[in-house]
């Protein structure tokens, strides 16, 4: 169970934010301090597995062919991009950008990685969506399932950044535990732990925000 202060903050946000006619995202607004973000070592770039996921199915794109591609589709991949389609995307940047925006993340067989970097790096890189390599000893189905509960903490060179922690339809307890996992990870990876956290607020898409750190 999450610590009481985090749970109370989540409950307050959910109770005091007007209900919308769509499923709102619940996010964290993270503000860092006392860090020179021009130095790559101070930038946050961490994958976190949320104990309760995001309350929605992530759209995962997989660059693969043959049996791996078939198994990726069976495991729930939103898109399976073959080597032929990859070549087509290289010459159609509009289509490549559309695909990049529609997918939450990408996975690729290792033999695809050099071509992806060369032809799609300019599209995927700035979005933080360069593919996760599928290593030869890794099962594509298991990897897809594990990534359904994964998020990326990515500050780039900014002191302030946002990250989703779930949907408003989730229980306060589940959301609070997701928040606690993220705060704990930040405390672990930041140079001075919590002393590098100026504030952390939990908020809904269009509603109230409440401080948790």
Curated annotation (Swiss-Prot):
One of its GO terms (cellular component) is large ribosomal subunit. HAMAP family: Ribosomal_uL1_A (MF_01318_A). Part of the 50S ribosomal subunit. It comes from Methanosarcina barkeri (strain Fusaro / DSM 804). GO terms for molecular function: rRNA binding; structural constituent of ribosome; tRNA binding. Keywords: Repressor, Ribonucleoprotein, Ribosomal protein, RNA-binding, rRNA-binding, Translation regulation, tRNA-binding. CDD domains: Ribosomal_L1 (cd00403). One of its GO terms (biological process) is regulation of translation. Belongs to the universal ribosomal protein uL1 family. SUPFAM superfamilies: Ribosomal protein L1. This is Large ribosomal subunit protein uL1. Binds directly to 23S rRNA. Probably involved in E site tRNA release. Protein L1 is also a translational repressor protein, it controls the translation of its operon by binding to its mRNA. PROSITE patterns: RIBOSOMAL_L1. It holds the Pfam family Ribosomal_L1. InterPro entries: Ribosomal_uL1, Ribosomal_uL1-like, Ribosomal_uL1/biogenesis, Ribosomal_uL1_3-a/b-sand, Ribosomal_uL1_arc, Ribosomal_uL1_CS.
